[in-house]
Regions:
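N-terminal localization/anchoring segments of enzymes in phospholipid and broader phosphate metabolism
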Residues: 1-529, 547, 551, 563-585, ...
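Hydrophobic alpha/beta core scaffold segments
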Residues: 554-558
């Protein structure tokens, strides 16, 4: 089936292009467009740190046993670089268009040579009060190589020309300045002029301040060019048997900071001699690694572009809705025992879930709390509630994944805090990331479980669309408890009747559910599959979906990211359609619905259809029996499939065409529905 499987990394590039498209849309508020540029750039940086680094390692490997993989990696790298070059041109044009439109709206970006006297005075004062001491140049003539200078930072390469009256040519020196953007932020608001808000890149602030930075070095003129380099994010894990898990991960994070440069982006107006010196100091000699760019790098900072108080240039805010039935004076744990409850963040407030943990921490009815944690907020209310529970005499067990990429240091910090408070901290199973989102609360009056699709992270809950189901159904709660037992004793065989749990049972059960739809289609029964998911790259699942399509099963997919499946191929996948939504919220929930001959089966949980989720992680999908939640899951998928404003057709070729039809924005309609339902429930409760 040639052309029926898309390489995951090419598919990812198509996904990220959908984000760039959102920045290009004229009907999107201008500051939101600026933010989408930042998101696009941030995604690309992480992609190069992780996926391109992995492909490069394979392509450069001397292992004779992976010749086929090596050739495939080289081919993929070439295709990605071609796509990236095309998308970069689009990106630069979008930056210019948005900057021009911003100026029409009264927000202007200034260069260092465009400042009036008041603004120059402001910049000089800023340098003396905040920047002085944070900008320490390194003379390239005095170093043989640029050492471990961190990752993903921006540098200014400075050409300094010192003039002497008795010489016709200046003495030329080159220096590097690491941008202090982590401390200062990337943008500086200047005093207004001509009724305009004025913004300046920190890069240009430093350009203006170069004579002050090099003061005492004699009369000179300066040129400065930005560049950045991205490093391989792979961690080298210590195999020392005497090291604990936490120590190994901490060493691994440290090794990442001195990883090999994967990509260097430089200002294309930089003199060749200066670029050559930088490449020499970085020990880079392959042209594939070097990418020319514009005046500014690290466009991910556009996510934090100053809004100057201009809410009119952003989408209206959707305030998270408090579900009235979860906000009564009644115990929330008792409310869950009456009926399955759920929240769908960010539409609903994450505080309802925090209330569950806080009540469990204080209630004398609660004996123990078990939780899986993958990523956590900086000031995590989840952790604070768990510490409170431990201090109130509950047995609290936390399974924390130390290898959550780029959150390793944060998770080490939280692990120590939890241990200091008397919480039992388990670091999971070697070789298996724990990605499931579970809570088990042991109570005298009846146990409770929470199963989610996303992280227990207050920050994520403001941006990522995720479900959290809270239940007291004994058959599900018992099995959630069994998952925690499996994590603590992973070599003990465990069977699950209700939950779909990887790495042992989830994949075969999903394949069986698809096969059941094929059988129903052949018997003339109702047969269809609706899926909302982040990624589909598992070859066995893709092949089974193709079989189902050929058997007459209609398959509708709402997908955010990687999609190796190609919908609409004659004789292969003509019964499969897929769309991807890019909007205010990041689509993150995983939902599966199978027609089951007219008696649909519903599932939600943490797993995508990728080998890593189905084989290399502990993931959990739960069946959903509550009719209200079933209706909500189906509505979410159906609205997404109908979306004509923010959904693109996923076709395996990266065309990302918009759907036809009357304007319909699924996220907006969901919020309107939830708001109406909340008001109606309030009326019922207050009668």
């Amino acid at each position: 089936m040639k052309g029926a499987f898309v390489e995951r990394d090419l598919s990812w590039m198509y996904f990220n292009h959908r984000i760039l498209q959102e920045a290009e849309k004229k009907n999107v508020p201008i500051l939101e467009r600026m933010s989408f540029l930042g998101i696009y750039s941030n995604n690309l940086d992480e992609f190069f740190r992780v996926r391109m680094a992995s492909l490069n390692r394979i392509a450069l490997s001397k292992d004779k046993n992976i010749k086929q993989d090596r050739e495939r990696a080289k081919k993929t790298i070439k295709e990605i670089n071609h796509l990236n070059a095309c998308y970069n041109k689009e990106f630069e044009k979008a930056v210019d268009d948005i900057t021009e439109e911003l100026e029409k709206q009264g927000i202007r970006l200034l260069h260092e040579n465009e400042l009036n006297e008041e603004q120059q005075l402001f910049i000089r004062r800023l340098y003396l009060e905040k920047l002085n001491g944070s900008t320490n140049p390194i003379w390239l003539s005095q170093v043989k190589e640029i050492g471990a200078t961190g990752d993903d930072g921006i540098f200014l390469a400075v050409k300094r020309m010192e003039w002497h009256e008795d010489k016709k040519k200046p003495k030329v020196d080159y220096a590097l300045i690491s941008m202090p953007d982590k401390e200062m932020g990337r943008f500086v608001r200047l005093p207004k002029s001509d009724g305009m808000e004025n913004i300046m890149y920190l890069d240009d602030v430093i350009r203006y301040c170069l004579p002050m930075i090099f003061i005492g070095e004699g009369k000179a003129t300066y040129e400065a060019y930005s560049f950045k380099f991205t490093k391989d994010a792979e961690m080298e894990m210590d195999n020392d048997l005497n090291s604990g898990v936490m120590q190994k991960v901490a060493k691994g994070v440290k090794s990442r900071k001195s990883g090999e440069p994967i990509r260097v982006i430089y200002d294309d107006s930089m003199p060749k001699e200066l670029l050559k010196r930088i490449m020499s100091r970085l020990n880079i000699d392959t042209l594939d690694t070097i990418v020319s760019g514009g005046r500014y790098q690290n466009h991910k900072d556009l996510m934090a572009f100053p809004d100057c108080g201009r809410d009119d240039l952003k989408y209206p805010k959707w305030t998270p809705i408090l579900k009235p039935e979860l906000e009564t004076e009644q115990s929330i744990l008792d409310t869950i025992r009456q009926k399955d409850r759920f929240i769908h963040v960010p539409y609903h407030s994450f505080n309802s879930f925090i209330r569950v943990l806080r009540e469990a921490a204080l209630s004398p009815d609660v004996k123990a709390i078990n939780v899986t944690l993958y990523r956590l907020a900086k000031a995590s209310k989840v952790v604070k509630a768990l510490i409170c529970a431990a201090r109130n005499g509950k047995k609290v067990t936390v399974v924390i994944e130390l290898l959550a990429r780029f959150d390793e240091e944060s998770n080490i910090k939280w692990s120590k805090r939890l241990q200091e408070a008397g919480v039992e901290v388990i670091f999971g199973v070697e070789g298996l990331k724990i990605h499931s989102k579970l809570v088990y609360i042991s109570c005298k009056s009846g146990d409770i479980a929470c199963i989610g699709t996303g992280n227990l992270h207050e920050g994520n809950a403001k941006v990522y669309t995720d479900y959290m189901m809270m239940t007291a159904r004994p058959q599900i709660v018992r099995e959630v408890k069994k998952v925690f037992e499996f994590i603590s004793k992973p070599f003990k065989p465990v069977k699950f009747r209700e939950l779909l749990v990887s790495p042992n049972e989830m994949k075969p059960k999903i394949l069986r559910l698809i096969s059941d739809e094929m059988r129903n289609a052949k018997e003339g029964l109702e047969a269809w599959i609706k899926v909302k998911i982040n990624h589909i790259t598992d070859e066995d699942v893709v092949a089974k979906l193709y079989e189902a399509s050929q058997a007459g099963v209609k398959i509708s997919i709402l997908i955010r990211g990687n999609c190796s499946l190609v919908p609409g191929l004659p004789g292969i996948s003509e019964n499969i359609s897929a769309v991807g939504i890019i909007d205010t919220y990041l689509e993150h929930s995983r939902i599966l619905i199978f027609a089951n001959g007219g008696n649909p089966k519903y599932y939600l949980g943490s797993a995508d259809w990728m080998p890593r989720n189905l084989v290399n992680r502990i993931e959990v999908l739960t069946p959903v029996y509550d009719e209200e939640l079933q209706h909500d899951l189906e509505r979410t998928i159906d609205y997404g499939l109908r979306d004509t404003t923010n959904a693109r057709i996923v076709d395996g070729r990266g065309t990302n065409a918009f759907q036809d039809g009357a304007p319909f924005r699924s996220q907006e309609q969901l919020y309107v529905d939830y708001l109406k339902e909340s008001q109606e429930m309030n009326n019922v409760i207050n009668k």
